[in-house]
Design a protein with these regions (language model features):
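Flexible hinge/switch segments at interdomain interfaces of large molecular machines
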Residues: 243-249
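Hydrophobic "anchor" residues on beta-strands that sit immediately upstream
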Residues: 253
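Short acidic, Gly/Ser-rich segments with clustered Asp/Glu that frequently serve as metal-coordination loops
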Residues: 258-261
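Subset of Sec-pathway N-terminal targeting signals
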Residues: 1-236, 242
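Cleft-lining beta-strand/loop regions that shape enzyme active-site pockets
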Residues: 237, 247, 256
């Protein structure tokens, strides 16, 4: 018998994220954020790409701008109900299950654009966001966890957050990542974080405390479940002073009520 005709092999469709760079400027409670993501079509056919950006939850987003290789593209901000419908459509097609983590928060979506085999595209998103605040503590969040479902590790992940505050900056702390902090003076600081060849496992989160008092202190509490023990985080920092100025004495007292009342 004649050998059967070989079946055609479907072209491989794949991509990798080469770099993800986040550059933010925070003035008091308002953040101007620029996100640049470079991805490469590593497959053998044209890739129809659609850039989807889950919005930071509880963040007021304004002034959205999208550029692809420096060219501005039409894009739209979807409300929560429409975003939920699109999310569920992705799940039915087994695409990007990470989007389930952001159901109900809304998302940013571009038009589809082609990427030739072997070509790279740089997508840049700029937006202004009103940050959440807990007393004197300001919370900056970037939704990085949705990238953990990418098929390959991201070659370079880089964060730079420049903080400017009218009040004196006290504590600066990231609960999720190891960061480098450079303080130019008591009103300005730059926070940086970089990783190579990693698949993100959680969002990037940064807290900073700004106060006019000589000693800044903030407390955060967390309880995973009603039946589990809770935790608290105390951030305390004196103001940044010149060498010739007197240092403020510090006495730290912790009071724990175990009565259950």
């Amino acid at each position: 018998p004649r050998p059967g005709r070989p079946r055609p092999v479907a072209p491989v469709m794949s991509y990798k994220i080469k770099s993800l760079e986040v550059d933010a400027r925070v003035r008091d409670q308002v953040a101007q954020v620029q996100v640049s993501q470079t991805f490469v079509n590593t497959g053998s056919r044209v890739l129809e790409a659609c850039f989807v950006f889950p919005l930071p939850y509880d963040g007021a987003i304004d002034r959205l701008t999208l550029l692809v290789d420096g060219k501005e593209y039409e894009a739209k901000l979807l409300p929560a109900a429409k975003a939920r419908s699109i999310y569920e459509g992705y799940i039915r097609r087994n695409q990007d299950p990470a989007l389930l983590e952001w159901m109900g928060t809304g998302m940013f979506k571009t038009s589809v654009f082609p990427v030739p085999p072997g070509a790279a595209r740089k997508v840049t998103l700029r937006f202004t966001q009103l940050l959440k605040k807990y007393g004197q503590l300001t919370d900056f969040l970037y939704p990085l966890a949705s990238a953990k479902f990418t098929s390959r590790p991201i070659e370079t992940i880089r964060f730079r957050v420049a903080i400017e505050s009218r009040a004196k900056i006290k504590s600066i702390y990231s609960s999720t990542h190891s960061v480098d902090i450079h303080r130019a003076d008591e009103h300005h600081a730059v926070v940086q974080c970089e990783a190579q060849n990693q698949v993100p496992g959680e969002d990037f989160r940064l807290f900073f405390d700004a106060d006019q008092q000589k000693l800044g202190a903030s407390v955060l509490t967390y309880r995973p479940h009603e039946s589990e023990d809770g935790y608290f985080l105390l951030l305390a920092s004196p103001e940044v002073k010149a060498a010739r100025e007197d240092r403020q004495d510090k006495t730290v007292i912790l009071v724990v009520d175990r009565s259950g009342s």
